[in-house]
Amino acid sequence: MVIGIDPGPRESAFVVWDGERVVASGDLPNQELATYLDSACSSVACEWIESFGMAVGREVFETVFAVGMFSQHVDRLRLVPRRDVKLHLCQSPRAKDGNIRQALIDRFGEVGTKKNRGPLFGISQHRWAALAVAVTAFDLPTTDHEATFHMPEPEPAA
C-alpha cells in the first residue's frame, strides 16, 4: 500500500492506495496528518514543490514546512514532483489537473455513488492529486526527478 499526499500550507489531502482501489482518503490539518503517519506502515509519497524561477509567497514556504514535518513521522518519504506524475499518467509534461483526473478514471473506473461505489469512491478536489502521487509511487520504484528523505538512525549515547 502507498499513502499519497497532496500537501498544503495548513491542510493536506491524503489517499491510501492498495494498487486497485482507494482504501481511505481525507483532508486533515497538517499536524493531524503527521500524527496519522506515525501509525502508517505503508510507503508514503508526497507531491514535491518545484521551483520554476517565479517569486513565491508565504503559503509555499508553509507547505514546504509541512512536508518537512511529515518526513519526521515516517522512516522514508518519497518526494515525487508533479512533472513526474504528469509524465507517468498522461505521458505529457503539459497535462493539467483535468487530464490527470481523466487518466485515473480511464484506468480505474468511475468514482461511483454511495450505493454503487467505484474503486475511486471518495476522491474529489485535492484528493485527485494525492491519488495521482500514490498511483505513481505504487507503479514506479522511482521517478526521474524524485528525492527521498530517510530519517537518520539516532547515534548511540556516549
Predicted features, each with a name:
Residues 1-158:
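Phosphate- and other anionic-substrate recognition elements at nucleic-acid/protein interfaces
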